[in-house]
A protein has these predicted regions:
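Short, glycine/charged-enriched secondary-structure capping and boundary segments
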Residues: 22, 84-87, 116-119, 218-222, ...
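Glycine-rich, flexible loop/turn motifs
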Residues: 26-34, 41-43, 51-54, 83, ...
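C-terminal-of-GTPase-core extension/linker across diverse P-loop GTPases
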Residues: 2-8, 13, 19, 147-354, ...
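Conserved G1/Walker A P-loop phosphate-binding module
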Residues: 1-114, 123, 142-143, 148
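Switch/coupling subdomain of P-loop NTPase systems
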Residues: 96, 100-103, 108-136, 140-143, ...
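Flexible beta-alpha connector loops of hexameric P-loop NTPases
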Residues: 77-84, 118-133, 152-158, 212-213, ...
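Amphipathic alpha-helical transducer elements in NTP-driven molecular machines
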Residues: 35, 49-52, 65-71, 85-99, ...
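Conserved nucleotide-binding/hydrolysis micro-motifs of P-loop NTPases
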Residues: 25, 51-52, 76-78, 106-112, ...
Length: 365
């Protein structure tokens, strides 16, 4: 599976410019005007992974199919969004559908680009959106609690669990903390996810800096880094303008441009890696003469579940997984050599897939 990340931010912080660059499309109207993004724009990008191309080269695969990441450019919001101000209602509905939130913060100075609050203060911007999400969660819980309490009185065991979790979330939210700070036990995780609280989603702060500051960041991005560390969230420094420029270049030209800017890799690569880390994701590969393909799974996924990402029948009829570590596959020069060297393992249902595993699944139909 891939994963879906919602790109959010106050108007005119550069989020639509970033989205356009990442998806290599101009679908979003990145104009200097509040609420220019009226409906969510959805775009998929290939996840860059040099390992996949190395495997394809060794296996002489005819086709290379990377795994993909979905970005959703969600309409900008302002203070009062939880009450429907600005484009708040659309924002709140769309953000519930994503796995994580990439919160674009304006960390650049530019007198030609207006700020909805009339100042550049990324920490305050982050607090504005977090507050709106917390207020929306409070309202959602309070509305549902009335019905849950009635079910509890009627002896509904699931309702008892839901009431306990809702009240725990409400305590945190009313204390000014997002619901993600609540310590949830393993047996409560399913019910917790069903609450669909906005502030349970992991957050990645995207510091949008000027071109000259893309390599090292600036004082604004440093403030965000301190805030993110205190919250246990992640952050990444990107120049949306640079990403927009290199999205129009051929790969070799883009590499030269990045080198001139003192950047080791594109912002897209850093953003995706940060997203992977945030959601505890990893990649395994299937490789053969026909195709080399990357698949995304969550860390801790067992072999049958990983097989199910390809097709449900693979999981249902799982027998075993012939597995080669990426390093062994590459070092030894391919599948046959790895097999002859005893590096191909037969893994059963309890095997936890490791990042980079090259796998072939055997299953009953």
């Amino acid at each position: 599976m891939g994963f879906k990340m919602g790109i959010v931010g106050l108007p005119n912080v550069g989020k639509s410019t970033l989205f356009n660059a990442l998806t290599r499309t101009a679908a979003a109207q990145a104009a200097n005007f509040p609420f220019c993004t009226i409906e969510p724009n959805v775009g998929e990008v290939a996840v860059p992974d040099a390992r996949l191309f190395k495997l394809a080269d060794l296996a002489k695969s005819k086709q290379v199919i990377p795994t993909r990441m979905t970005f959703v450019d969600i309409a900008g919001l302002v203070k009062g969004a939880s009450k429907g101000e600005g484009l708040g209602n659309q924002f709140l509905a769309n953000i519930r559908e994503v796995d994580a939130i990439a919160h674009v913060l304006r960390c650049f100075e530019d007198g030609d680009v207006t700020h909805v609050e009339g100042r550049v203060d990324p920490v305050a911007d982050a607090e504005t959106i977090e507050t709106e999400l917390m207020l929306a969660d409070i309202e959602s819980i309070e509305k549902r609690l009335q019905n849950i309490v009635r079910k509890v009185r009627g002896g509904d065991k699931e309702a008892v669990q839901q009431e306990r979790l809702m009240k725990a979330a409400l305590v945190a939210l009313e204390d000014g903390q997002p619901a993600r700070v609540v310590n949830v036990e393993e047996e409560d995780l399913k019910a917790w996810k069903m609450l669909q609280l906005l502030t349970t989603k992991p957050v990645l702060y995207v510091c949008n800096v000027g071109e000259a500051e893309a390599a090292e960041g600036n004082d604004h991005s440093q403030e965000v880094a301190v805030m993110a560390a205190a919250q246990g969230n992640a952050h990444v420094i990107i120049s949306a303008q640079i990403e927009e420029e290199i999205s129009q270049l051929e790969d070799d030209e883009a590499a030269m441009f990045l080198d001139e800017m003192g950047l080791a890799e594109a912002g897209l690569d850093r953003l995706i890696q940060a997203g992977y880390d945030l959601l505890h994701l990893e990649t395994y590969f299937t490789v053969g003469p026909k195709e080399a393909r990357a698949w995304t799974i969550r860390q801790g996924t067992t072999a049958p579940k990983a097989a199910g990402v390809i097709h449900g029948d693979f999981e249902k009829g799982f027998i075993r997984a012939e597995t080669i570590a990426y390093s062994d596959f590459v070092t030894l020069g391919g599948e046959q050599a790895a097999k002859e060297s005893g590096k191909m393992r037969a893994e059963g249902k309890g095997y936890v897939v490791k990042d980079g595993d090259v796998m072939h699944f055997l299953f009953n139909t």
